[in-house]
Design a protein with these regions (language model features):
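P-loop NTP-binding module
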Residues: 1-269
Length: 269
């Protein structure tokens, strides 16, 4: 997976975009008519805001590597995680979800399972409402927590309020039942889990056992080779879809074994 990304300018700000805009974001994309006319989108969603950019093209390559594997069937449930909290896992998960949803026939459900430091809701400008935490702790029904996005075929399951016991919630039997339920109920779509680093949280390992494949995000110049190999050993080689490298300088690329590393430049978790 050779992928090139540059750091989006003013990544701390949100773009205000209207449905009648000429911005490339809406070119060839089916919008959700039920969502309000104005969207506040984080500039890090390069696959939507800059669909003709090198960054968006690299995400399309990442998507194609996953959707069209050399062997076997495509993984329908995908966990995106990282070695460290600031390696860019949410950036990769969100842009991968958009890229898949831009396909003609593909639908995507994106879950923010980082209950300690959630960010998916902020990226998509959907507000700070209830989500996974409330489902696990209060028994709120799943359909009422799913949030429609500006893309007709992309749905978000936000993290909700930060709980005092994230490890217990994500390792619970109710979480296991949730994964089984969404895989059964939404078998027609790809399901992407944005999860925290496994060496910091035990709950990520519980989720990894219930997904079809895993994408690991690392940081160039920071994550050590032995740390990556340790993650691969934890999850098992058969589960690893690929490893992507964030923050790399342009023109730098390398790989560990059969797992491809790309060239990213980005500065958010």
């Amino acid at each position: 997976m050779g992928n090139n990304f540059k750091a989006p300018e003013n990544s701390h700000q949100h773009n205000q975009i209207r449905k009648d805009t000429e911005n490339d974001f809406f070119s060839g994309i089916r919008l959700n008519p039920d969502v309000v006319e104005t969207y506040y989108i984080d500039p890090v969603l390069v696959t939507g805001l800059e669909p003709q950019s090198i960054e968006a093209e690299q995400f399309r390559q990442l998507k194609n590597n996953i959707l069209f594997p050399e062997k076997g069937t495509p993984p329908k449930s995908i966990m995106v995680t990282s070695f460290s909290p600031s390696d860019g896992k949410s950036f990769v998960a969100a842009n991968l979800a958009i890229s898949i949803a831009q396909n003609i026939d593909e639908y995507v459900l994106l879950l923010d399972c980082d209950l300690r430091s959630p960010s998916i809701h902020s990226m998509f400008g959907i507000g700070d409402g209830p989500g996974l935490c409330e489902y696990l702790s209060q028994g709120i029904q799943l359909p009422s927590l799913l949030v429609k996005t500006f893309l007709d075929k992309l749905t978000i399951f936000p993290a909700g309020k930060i709980p005092p016991n994230p490890a217990e919630l994500l390792s619970s039997d109710r979480m296991k039942r949730l994964i089984k339920e969404i895989r059964s109920r939404y078998s027609d779509r790809y399901i992407i889990f944005d999860t925290p680093p496994p060496h910091l949280t035990a709950e990520t390992n519980a989720i990894s056992r219930q997904v079809d494949g895993i994408v690991i995000v690392i940081q160039h110049g920071k994550t050590r080779k032995k740390d990556v190999l340790n993650l691969i050993d934890i999850y098992g080689k058969e589960k690893i879809l690929g490893v992507v490298c964030n923050f790399a300088r342009k023109g730098i690329g390398y790989g560990y074994g059969k797992y491809g590393y790309g060239k990213y430049g980005y500065g958010q978790k």
